[in-house]
């Protein structure tokens, strides 16, 4: 693929339609319990002891930031929209949580030395927090 190949890109949506789609995604309903579930997942990455995840205290150097919560809300709404729903379900969270958090949780050097997988860390968090 060369730079010349960009000349053949066809426009499939205009700005007005894109803005309408963004508004539709923003209007996807997310239940308060699911919002709390997402907040707990993010918080558990920063404060594992508060969630009885003592084994992760020395493994997680930096948990996901509060900004990750906002991005997770956006991602689950987008996923619900792409699945044809006008509401977020626990399935939407399950489908995107690892992809959303994988680069936001920084493992400690100890964890890296032990070759601990970030997906396993996220899974441990998910297993401790009840799905609404």
Residue map of PLM features:
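Conserved C-terminal "switch" segment of AAA+ ATPases
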Residues: 1-55, 82-86, 90, 111-113, ...
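C-terminal engagement/docking regions of AAA+ P-loop ATPases
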Residues: 47-132
